[in-house]
């Protein structure tokens, strides 16, 4: 049985009364955003709006994007990525479970030196799949050309942000490549692997 979204008490500034709001709403106010779904247009629009709002609200404080996503649409992923580069605050990206496909692309898109993976996180990169349209023959050719352009754009970002040679990225994108947190750090997708807190007592 689903437990629903937990609610927590919150007090607005200049208001003594407290209200109950869902935990994600509360965390958004602390500049903590979550990508815990397939990347698609609705999720992309929500994140784009939140990035812009938080960027305007305070240009000096970092924004935290927690990622646990199997990936999703290329265009939606680029919309999120481009907004991350557009806003003034640094975006700290944190992989808390799985960052696959467009999830790993957004993970690598965080501010350099501020990309983190939890110790048991997994990262997967691969080339974009054909998922634009139900195609006929001519449309399939046009789609293949568009996918090739998008693949080149993805590869260019990975090269710039990991420091890997373009031939390494091109070769690894030919198949599903799964990486542990430490392997993702060595690859240049993340900068830091989070460590567990020391046990109490």
UniProtKB/Swiss-Prot annotation:
EC numbers for this chain: 3.4.21.92
A GO-annotated cellular component: plastid stroma
Localisation per UniProt entry: Plastid
Membrane-crossing residue ranges in chain numbering: none
Similarity remark: Belongs to the peptidase S14 family.
Record's function text: Cleaves peptides in various proteins in a process that requires ATP hydrolysis. Has a chymotrypsin-like activity. Plays a major role in the degradation of misfolded proteins.
Name of the protein described by the UniProt record: ATP-dependent Clp protease proteolytic subunit
Lineage: Eukaryota, Viridiplantae, Streptophyta, Embryophyta, Tracheophyta
